[in-house]
Every structure is written in C-alpha cells, then in structure tokens.
Curated annotation (Swiss-Prot):
GO terms for molecular function: ribosome binding. Binds ribosomal protein uS19. It is found in: Cytoplasm. This is Ribosome maturation factor RimM. Residues 98-171 form the PRC barrel domain. The lineage of its organism: Bacteria, Bacillati, Bacillota, Bacilli, Lactobacillales. The gene is rimM. NCBIfam families: 16S_RimM. An accessory protein needed during the final step in the assembly of 30S ribosomal subunit, possibly for assembly of the head region. Essential for efficient processing of 16S rRNA. May be needed both before and after RbfA during the maturation of 16S rRNA. It has affinity for free ribosomal 30S subunits but not for 70S ribosomes. The keyword RNA-binding does not apply. The keyword Amino-acid biosynthesis does not apply. Keywords: Chaperone, Cytoplasm, Ribosome biogenesis, rRNA processing. It comes from Levilactobacillus brevis (strain ATCC 367 / BCRC 12310 / CIP 105137 / JCM 1170 / LMG 11437 / NCIMB 947 / NCTC 947) (Lactobacillus brevis). GO terms for biological process: ribosomal small subunit biogenesis; rRNA processing. One of its GO terms (cellular component) is ribosome.
Length: 172
C-alpha cells in the first residue's frame, strides 16, 4: 500500500487532545475532514498508527485536529513530529482539475525537450512561492531547475512517462 504525506504534527494544542498540523496538501478541507482516516508515521516506527479525525479547525497557519478515542493531551503527545499520510485509496481524482497532477505522478517522469532531447528524470518538486519548481537530475551535470509555468512545461504525458519542456534562455 502506498502512502502520501498530507501534513506534519508539529505540537499539541491545549489539554483536550488537539494537535497542531502544518498541511502539505492542496486539499486540507477533504484530507482533514471529520471522519477522515489518517496514518501517523512516528520516528523509529515501521508501522503507522491509524487515526480518525474527530474535529478540525483552522488556527493561524495551522490546522487543529483531534482524533477519535484521544480526548487528552496525554493521548496525543506521542504524535508530536509525526508525519500524517493518506493511502492511495483516499486520493480522489476529482480533486484535480485538468492539467493538475499529484507530486507522486510527476516525480520519476523523464524531462524531454520539444526537440526530443532527454534531459533526465524529475527527482523532486519544490514549492518556494509563486510556482512549483521541478528538479531534474541530469547524468554528469548539476540538477536542472524547471519552473512550473506554461512557457516551460509544455505537456505532461503520464502514459508515456514524460514531460515535454521548452528551455528558456538561462535555464540550462
């Protein structure tokens, strides 16, 4: 079963079993909805703990979650610094508009220029601000950083396992 990260528990909040979560998903409303199942991966633990969201509210830049069967701070303190994940069963394709993709769909694809030159494989996606940056691992060269803008990313072909790109001046 594949798991995908949706947030990190950074601390507890109050004494009634709430935790502060930094979301790393574009869909926090559905991922953290009451009744949702999340999997907490703790450091040095191979097996995740299954948690069901009992309540959710937003507070500053965090989501405050409580979980069924965990009514006090003592029940949730062990989850500090845990990574919250969902399974591929919880990913809904209707979350995405045409032309949008999950990170795991992009990472591993070949980056190919419009002229057919293979640049390398996309190894990670950075989110520094206005737009994502796709990092391409190039054999024998330093990594290539491709901004996720229409002028650079021309087409994503999941069936062929490649992304067609047009290198703008200064990118290479």
């Amino acid at each position: 079963m594949a798991y995908y990260t949706v947030g990190t528990i950074v601390n507890t909040h109050g004494i009634k079993g709430e935790v502060r979560v930094v979301a790393t998903t574009d869909f926090p409303e559905s991922r953290f909805a009451v009744g949702s199942t999340l999997y907490a991966f703790q450091k040095d633990q191979a097996t995740p703990v299954t948690l069901t969201v009992a309540s959710v509210r937003q507070h500053k830049n965090f989501y405050l979650l409580s979980f069924e069967g965990k009514p006090s701070i003592n029940d949730v303190e062990i989850f500090k610094q845990s990574t919250l994940k969902v399974t591929d069963n919880e990913l809904e394709s209707n979350d995405l508009r045409p032309g949008e993709y999950y990170y795991h769909q992009i990472v591993g694809l070949d980056a190919v220029t419009v002229d057919g030159e293979n640049l390398g494989k996309i190894k990670e996606i950075l989110s520094p601000g206005a737009n994502d940056v796709w990092v391409v691992a190039r054999p024998g060269k330093s990594d290539l950083l491709l901004p996720k803008i229409d002028q650079v990313i021309k087409r994503v072909d999941l069936d062929q396992g490649k992304v067609i790109v047009e290198l703008m001046e200064g990118l290479d």
